[in-house]
Amino acid sequence: MSGPQGSDPRQPWQPPGQGADHSSDPTVAAGYPWQQQPTQEATWQAPAYTPQYQQPADPAYPQQYPQPTPGYAQPEQFGAQPTQLGVPGQYGQYQQPGQYGQPGQYGQPGQYAPPGQYPGQYGPYGQSGQGSKRSVAVIGGVIAVMAVLFIGAVLILGFWAPGFFVTTKLDVIKAQAGVQQVLTDETTGYGAKNVKDVKCNNGSDPTVKKGATFECTVSIDGTSKRVTVTFQDNKGTYEVGRPQ
């Protein structure tokens, strides 16, 4: 059975442009208006999407997208700051406690260990011993000088004035003459008559000493008398006592 010629609805749909061209067929154009829609869609899709997808090729977008690159590159500045903050190398300089921990300077017992150095260090104390010897010598010299002065003083006082060690002797002959004169002198003496044979101290020179005495024998008017003579000082001044 035959009908009007046209597309068979039982045949599968073919997109426009494939198979026979029915655009000039009024029946198809009127009875199947939906077939023009794909043509319109194809015609619409060509200009519509093409400029939209070509816009990313616009150089304005690449200029906008690279901007974040320097913007995001700023974290590198923040990343650099941690580098500055993380300069613990400066804090790491606290490893300088190695300077404190240089036990080699403290623990060099080699400088302290050699006992031979200690006697060398005690050597200066030996110099103090020399100083003590010098002080002893000085003290000894002072004592010697003082001793010399003392001895000199003793010698002066003993042999010169008042002459403790000097033994002054009175000439016994002069002493006898002096005793006879005192006995016979009528003004300053006893005014005795016939005074003779005066002998003193058994003929020995008496020692002059204050308070010392010596005895003299004398004959007065033929009578033997004894006279005591006393030294008044260390110079030889004497006093003749009354004849007895």
Swiss-Prot record:
The segment annotated Disordered runs over 1-127
* Residue ranges of the TM segments: 136-156
Ranges of compositional bias, category Low complexity:
45-75, 88-127
Top-level taxon of origin? Bacteria
Q: Which InterPro entries match?
A: DUF4333
GO annotation, cellular component aspect? peptidoglycan-based cell wall; plasma membrane
| Sequence ranges of Polar residues compositional bias | 34-43
Q: What keywords does the record list, in alphabetical order?
A: Membrane, Transmembrane, Transmembrane helix
Subcellular location, in the record's words? Answer: Membrane
Q: What is the membrane topology here?
A: Single-pass membrane protein
The entry's protein name is Uncharacterized protein Rv2091c
Can you name the source organism?
Answer: Mycobacterium tuberculosis (strain ATCC 25618 / H37Rv)
